[in-house]
Amino acid sequence: MKSNQFLGIAGMVLAMIACHKVEIIRPPEGGTSTPFSGKGTFKSNLLVQNRIPTSNTSPGDDESLVVSGDVGQYFSSTDFGKPSNPTKLPFLKSNTIAGLSLQPLPAGMKVVDYPGAFGVTADPEWNITSNWFKINPYEITYTGQATAEILQGNINSNRTLTADKTYLLRGQVFVNSGATLTIEPGTIIFGDSKPNDGILCINRGGKLIAKGTPEKPIVFTSPKLGTQRQRGDWGGIVVCGKAPNNKGTDVLVEGIEAGATGDGGKYGGNVPNDNSGEISYVRVEYAGIAVTPGNEVNGITFGSIGSATQLNHIIVSVGGDDGLEWFGGSVNARFIGLYDILDDDLDMDAGYTGNIQFVYSLRNPYAADVSLTGSLEITSSKTAGSSPQSAPVIANMTSVGPIYLVGEGAFNPNHEGGCRVSADARSQFINNVVIGWPRALMNF
C-alpha cells in the first residue's frame, strides 16, 4: 500500500463538462450483444469528477442527475478526505443543488433537504465530534492486549463482556441459539491473528447486543501494536439469521470453515422480522481475511438478518475484504462510515431488501482488490428470476473515490465503479453523491 493514510481521453473530457453521458458497451468484434443483468435505478444524484457518469442505464432510470467536473462548485473545500487530510469531511456549499430534485424516501427513512451523507453541516445523529466517529484508526492506540481474556469455542448461555476488561477472540467463536452475547459500552475486543484468526459468529437464534454510545463506542480491532497493524490482522464478525434469501434455508455463510459442526455459520429461513440483536456505536478495524480463495470474512457479514435487528452507527476501517456484506435478509442500516476498504465498501447479494441511509465512504486510492472494487456492489443471483430478488434502497450516501483523491493515472486501476448493479439485482440509488470514480453508476 503506497500510503497508509489512506475510457480514454474522450471519456475524461465528457466527465468534466456539465452534461450527462450514457456509455454503451459494445460486444467484441464478431460477437453478439449480451444484455446487462443489473436493473439499478439512479435518481437525484450529484456526480462530480467521475470519468464516466453512467453505464448501461435505461431512459427514466437515471433522472435528475447533476454531472460536473468541478469539486469547488458544490463543496465548501477541495481537499476533504485527501491522503494528507483524511478526516476532513465533504460538506456542501449549499443544501440545494440546481437541477437536482430530491426523490421521496420509503417510510421510516429520515427526510433531509440535501443529497449525500452531509449537507452544509452534518446531521447531529452523525456525532462527528464523538469518540465513536474516528474514521482513521491509524491515529488510535489501544492497551490491554497482553492481559486480554480469551474467548473461544461456543457460547451456549447468556454472557456479558464488561468494559473493565479487554478480550481476545481466538478462532471461530460461536454464540449459539438461545444465547445472547451482551457487550458493554466502551469494551475493546481484539481478534487473534494467524494461525488462530479470530471470528465472532452469531448463529441463528442467538443474539448480539453490542450497544455502545457516542463517547463509549465498542471496538473490535487488531491485537497488534502501533505500525504493526494492517488490514487482515483478524477475521471479522458474522451474524446469521432466519430471514428469507434466494439461496436456501440452510446456507453456510462465507468465511466460516466448512467443517463447522451443527448450525454454526448457517443462515436462512422464512422469518422476515427475525431479531439478531443490535449493533450500534461500534467500530471494526483491520479485519477481513480469506479463509480459502473466494471464501472471505468481511468487516461484518450479515446472512438473512431480519428487520427487527438494529444496525446503526457502525464504522469499518482498513478492511481486507468488503466493509459490510449482506446475503439476503431485510434489515435496515443507518449512519455507516467506511475507510480504506480493500474490496467493496458495501456488498449486497442473495435477495437483500433492506434500506440503507447515511453512508460515508472514503477510499484508499492505492488499495483495491484484484476482483475489481466499487463503493457499492449489488447482486442477486446468477439465475434470473430467483426470489426474493435483491432490491435495496440506498439514500444519502457520499462516496469519495480515487480520481478525486490522487488524480488520473495515480490510483490503483482495480477501482471500477461507485455503484455497481448486476446479477439480476434491482435497486434504488437515490439522493446520493458520487465523487471521483472511473464509472460513477453502472449496470453490468
Which functions belong to the PLM regions below?
Residues 1-7:
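Bacterial N-terminal signal peptides that target proteins for export
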Residues 7-14:
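Sec-dependent N-terminal signal peptides
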Residues 21:
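Short, conserved catalytic or interaction motifs in soluble domains
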Residues 24-182, 192-205, 217-321, 325-342, ...:
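Extracellular beta-rich repeat passengers
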Residues 211:
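Conserved H-D interstitial segment of serine endopeptidase catalytic domains
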